[in-house]
């Protein structure tokens, strides 16, 4: 067997992975990866949230071909509630880890446009048992001890929700999906930097930064009042 992947440190303030709200039609269609990563759920958004918008940055145009000034824009959206950190660093109490990547895009005859993507660290996982699941298959998929899975639900029942701690990362692919814990190859995400991020048309191959985000009160996008501080 291969070596178990190294988990990144927890602060104890990580959100739970759940499909509630975020995985329903309203949650899927109005909350992109940025909003999901920072926990800013909204029932109605006219367009997707982008870093720096809430900060009121004058020139919002960004090609996302590089990470230039993107981390600063994220911080400017929620000053004093978000700070940059190393990926291996433990966040302060009341904060959790978020990572940002970009897909530089592919050159065309006319333009080149990239994209950004965010992942957030979660600890407790709500998992809906599927037909054919075994304790061994669930433990193997999430890369957690078998005893932990058996304790969470001694007798597996398809369709029921089980809860256990996994210390993994979750993300949401724009307005196209609900919350996910799998990468582009369908594997559970223990560390986004080591996960597959190559999707058809978008390869989020460039790691920009890690942040520690306060676990409540974060707002992004056009649906909230401006911070009033330019970055």
Model regions: which residues?
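Short acidic, glycine/serine/threonine-rich helix-capping segments at coil-helix boundaries
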Residues: 131-133, 148-164
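Short, charged amphipathic recognition helices of the HTH superfamily
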Residues: 33, 67, 113-115, 134-137, ...
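Active-site or metal-binding loop neighborhoods of secreted/extracellular toxin and effector enzymes
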Residues: 158-231
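...with weaker cross-activation on analogous glycine-rich loops/strands in unrelated enzymes
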Residues: 62-125, 166-176
């Amino acid at each position: 067997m291969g070596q178990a992947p190294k988990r990144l440190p927890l602060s104890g303030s990580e959100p739970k992975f759940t499909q509630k709200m975020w995985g329903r039609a309203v949650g899927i269609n109005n909350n992109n990866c940025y909003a999901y990563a920072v926990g800013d759920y909204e029932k109605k958004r006219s367009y997707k949230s982008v870093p720096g918008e809430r900060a009121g940055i004058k020139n919002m145009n960004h090609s996302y071909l590089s990470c230039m000034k993107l981390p600063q824009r994220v911080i400017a959206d929620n000053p004093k509630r978000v700070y940059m950190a190393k990926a291996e660093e433990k966040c302060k109490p009341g904060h959790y880890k978020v990572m940002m990547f970009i897909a530089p895009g592919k050159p065309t005859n006319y333009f080149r446009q990239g994209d950004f993507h965010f992942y957030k660290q979660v600890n407790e996982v709500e998992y809906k048992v599927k037909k054919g699941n075994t304790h061994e298959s669930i433990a193997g998929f999430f890369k957690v001890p078998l005893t932990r899975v058996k304790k969470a639900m001694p007798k597996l029942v398809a369709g029921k929700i089980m809860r256990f701690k996994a210390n993994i990362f979750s993300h949401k692919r724009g307005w196209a999906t609900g919350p996910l814990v799998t990468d582009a190859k369908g594997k559970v995400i223990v560390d986004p930097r080591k996960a597959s991020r190559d999707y058809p048309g978008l390869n989020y191959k460039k790691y920009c930064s890690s942040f520690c985000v306060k676990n409540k009160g974060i707002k992004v996008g056009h649906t909230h009042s401006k911070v009033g501080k330019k970055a």
